[in-house]
Amino acid sequence: MYLFSEYDTFWIYLSISSLIPILAFSISRSLAPISKGAEKATSYESGIEPMGDTWIQFRIRYYMFALVFVVFDVETVFLYPWAMSFDILGLFTFIEAFIFVIILIVGLVYAWRKGALEWS
């Protein structure tokens, strides 16, 4: 009887999860019709042909909100395992997590005072 070594399951999972997207893209590429032409290069907006120049630049104001969200989302990723093993890790880990949260709060206050969270 063959027993899996410690990493055999990992390598099987990795190879299957790599093979599935490769197969999906290969099948799509071989079966999908390829049509190149001027029609592919035109912009399409709700079935209406654009009038005038269609390239405009505009300021994206959501990036700072997204950046602050990502910071606090990463904070959650770090704090969740700590909270689940709080009783095992002890006081030193609590102090480390507390300092981590304080640094993030200082960063939030800094972003708030700089106007990063203002819409205008």
UniProtKB/Swiss-Prot annotation:
It is an enzyme of class 7 (translocase). GO terms for biological process: photosynthesis, light reaction. The keyword Coiled coil does not apply. GO terms for molecular function: NADH dehydrogenase (ubiquinone) activity; quinone binding. The chain crosses the membrane at residues 7-27, 64-84, 88-108. NDH shuttles electrons from NAD(P)H:plastoquinone, via FMN and iron-sulfur (Fe-S) centers, to quinones in the photosynthetic chain and possibly in a chloroplast respiratory chain. The immediate electron acceptor for the enzyme in this species is believed to be plastoquinone. Couples the redox reaction to proton translocation, and thus conserves the redox energy in a proton gradient. NDH is composed of at least 16 different subunits, 5 of which are encoded in the nucleus. PANTHER family: NADH-UBIQUINONE OXIDOREDUCTASE CHAIN 3. This is NAD(P)H-quinone oxidoreductase subunit 3, chloroplastic. It comes from Cryptomeria japonica.
